[in-house]
């Protein structure tokens, strides 16, 4: 029973709720190293900034309720993290997010707050601009 609950929790974190996670999100383009490390490439990125003076462990990012990235390392205090959108993988397969084919419509962030509570913030986007947060 617990395993089933955790599976639902992992697949649909926005349905669970919790206090807000103090992290800012931006969408844009950034220069990232190529896979072989031989050069750099301008690509679509998601930029996350920890707005607090404490690290956020158990940090995960989800795009469009389908593409997930779970970060092993905590998001450090005041850290600015820039990630290529193509590194996000489908929760049910190994397919990668394609920002050319699909626009980012929602970003859901989860992580552990200093109180031990699980923080959740969801950002809704339209044409790359935040239109709502909850």
What residues fall within each predicted segment?
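Hydrophobic membrane-insertion alpha-helices, especially the h-region
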Residues: 1-9
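Terminal connector regions
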Residues: 11-18, 89-134
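Short extracytoplasmic/periplasmic juxtamembrane "stem" segments immediately C-terminal to an N-terminal membrane anchor
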Residues: 20-38
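Short, surface-exposed loop/turn motifs at beta-strand boundaries within globular domains
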Residues: 39-41, 54, 66-68, 102
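Structural beta-strand segments of beta-rich domains
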Residues: 42-46
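Asparagine-centered strand-capping/turn motif at beta-strand->loop junctions
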Residues: 47-53
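Short, hydrophobic/aromatic beta-strand segments
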Residues: 54-62
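Intrinsically disordered, low-complexity Pro/Gly/Ser/Thr-rich segments with frequent PxxP/GP/PP motifs
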Residues: 65-100
């Amino acid at each position: 029973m617990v395993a089933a609950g955790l599976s639902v929790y992992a697949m649909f974190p926005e349905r669970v709720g919790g206090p807000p996670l103090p992290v800012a999100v931006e969408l844009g383009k950034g220069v990232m190293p190529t896979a072989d490390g031989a050069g750099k490439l301008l690509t679509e990125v998601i930029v996350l900034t920890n707005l607090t003076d404490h690290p956020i462990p158990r940090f995960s990012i989800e795009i469009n309720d389908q593409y997930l990235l779970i970060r092993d390392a905590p998001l450090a205090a005041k850290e600015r993290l820039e990630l290529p959108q193509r590194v996000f993988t489908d929760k049910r397969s190994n397919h990668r997010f394609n920002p050319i084919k699909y626009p980012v419509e929602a970003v859901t962030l989860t992580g552990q707050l200093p109180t031990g509570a699980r923080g959740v913030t969801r950002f809704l986007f339209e044409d790359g601009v935040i239109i709502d947060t909850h």
